[in-house]
Amino acid sequence: MDINKLIHPEDAKALKALKSIPALPKLMEKVFQYGYDELAWSENVTTNLRLSEKQMPEIYNRLPPICERLGIPVPELYLQMSPIANSWTSGHKKVYIVVTLGLVKKLKEDELDAVLAHECGHILCQHVLYQTLANAIFTFGDFLTDSFVGVIGNAAMKPVKQALLLWSRASELTADRVACIFSPAMTLSRALARLDMIPKYIIEKMDFDVWASQGYDYEALRNGSAWNKIIHWMGDSDADHPYSPVRAYEAMRWEKTDTCNWLRSNPFTLEFQDDNTTKKNEEKNGANWSLSNVG
């Protein structure tokens, strides 16, 4: 099975547009030349708690089975002592996942599994490189822009940022698809509701199909009048994640597909073809991936 059947169409479309930006390769070169990747990792390793079989195994041990099923190396997992519920994946050279104490305290165990699978989805689908680029640009935007005189000017940075945000939103939908291989879309939706700060007593009474329909209604703006499309663009333009009802709708729709059901019920391994030779996941470098049944 071609991995493109797993990747959300909006993700593929946005990534193609992002890669078409002429200055992107030079921009990426500068970001890594300035050591942003190392800076972010050093801050992470000195301020967060690295989890393992010996360090809070009740959290860490949830990660390796997900990675094994996806055929990816197990990344380092860190716990940040922030009360704000959040998680992210970072690191181009050394990939790592961070979950916050607020997230662990807020989510039930099955919901935490969905979040970890979502983060592994970013690794599986090769999102981390562009996530690192986006984080660098939005963290050190002015400094980077000043250093790109003759390469990319201030005026050119805005469309780069917009393209990165568009892709970032779309990539979340792909990662949610990976989460749905391991967890029902309803579980993911409950986790999203908690991350939206919806109180527990409300979540217990919520009809998540109705909540997801709000996401459908919002996305329908894109297919309406020109003015509706502008409203949709204005609502999304500065966001790096889709709205949670949209994500719930997309996850529930994906859950009903044959592809999702097949991935849930069949063991598979990741392969890519290069001159008719199959290589291991960790040897890949921008090649075309496919999913193969090994059961």
Question: What are these regions, as identified by a protein language model?
Answer:
Residues 120-140, 186:
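Catalytic Zn2+-binding segment of zinc metalloproteases
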Residues 107, 116-125, 174, 178:
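Active-site His/Glu-centered metal-binding helix of metallohydrolases
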Residues 47, 54-60, 66-72, 150-221:
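Short helix/loop segments within enzyme catalytic domains
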Residues 50-54, 98-114, 163-166:
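Short pre-active-site segment immediately N-terminal to the catalytic Zn-binding motif
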Residues 63, 99, 118, 175, ...:
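Residue-level signature of catalytic and energy-coupling elements of molecular machines
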Residues 1-93, 162-164, 224, 232, ...:
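Hydrophobic or amphipathic, alpha-helical segments that drive membrane association/targeting
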